[in-house]
Amino acid sequence: VPLLIELKLPSVSTEICRYVYDLLKDYQGSCLIESFNPLGLRKYKQLDPDAIVGQLSGKYTAKDRLNPLIALLSSSLLVNALSRPDFVAYNFRTSDAFGFYLNQNLFRIPVFAWTVRTSEEFRKCRHAYDGIIFEKFLPAEIVC
């Protein structure tokens, strides 16, 4: 069974990465690790250089309740040079952010739109992103 695991790292502490790595190191299926915290992605890659990791990102406001440092690092995407994510999952509602522009034109790694919940949102994103993360919705065009 393929797994997509989001590391919830609300501060600069990356201690949980070791525990997740220990739990997954013998897993035989495919697994993607993603997080809003680029420090956690970097730590996980140090533990498992073959892991596929993704940076969750978007433009943040105070209501997002994210640690201010983590919000800055994540939204700017500038630390991607250190964390080296294999993909970015970006909040398509805030893709006018400077960090998104930089990623598209400088880092050139695959970008997935999150989280798409309607047909209208799907139509908006389908040609602008490399992939789409859906929630409680699957477009009729791609149902097998």
Language-model segments: residues:
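Short loop-to-alpha-helix "cap/lid" segments that border enzyme active sites
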Residues: V1-L3, L7-C144
